[in-house]
């Protein structure tokens, strides 16, 4: 085992190679909608490539500590956001925390007052944390892919749709624990009544009714 080693990773391929070594316990990585959708200096990799890193870290038990959740502050203003629409700090933090493998988010702060403001994240309503607006400016390749935002909630059947999708995505890449977590859910894809409520609300145009059938068939 190698202790106390810190190295830089210049791109997505390097991260995958590092994960291949099975030597790391933690990965510091910049996670935010801009970088995930290929906007910004540190936007390494495409939508699918970055998603694979998140899922693989979860599978391997490598915790992701998030840097630059606000894309250097650019996402907080209509004028500087690459999407032309601002997000709040709380939306950005929630976005990062919803990614597989993410354990901590480390936003920058210049004062105690800013830290106090960020800590109010824990006092926010679900509506204040809802970042589904990014569906309106996500790139075409992101369409049809669940990001676990749960904007489709509440499910009339009581299914935690985001969790069901996350555990399915993790299970399909070989995460054995994901199956256990899925089966431990109070409600799962088998409880779907195909009412279409989720499809009508999804900002990413995910066909959740079809997904639920696929997930049901996968887990048996």
What are these regions (language model features)?
Residues 1-65, 70:
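Glycine/proline-rich, positively charged
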Residues 23, 48-220:
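Structured C-terminal cap/extension of enzyme domains
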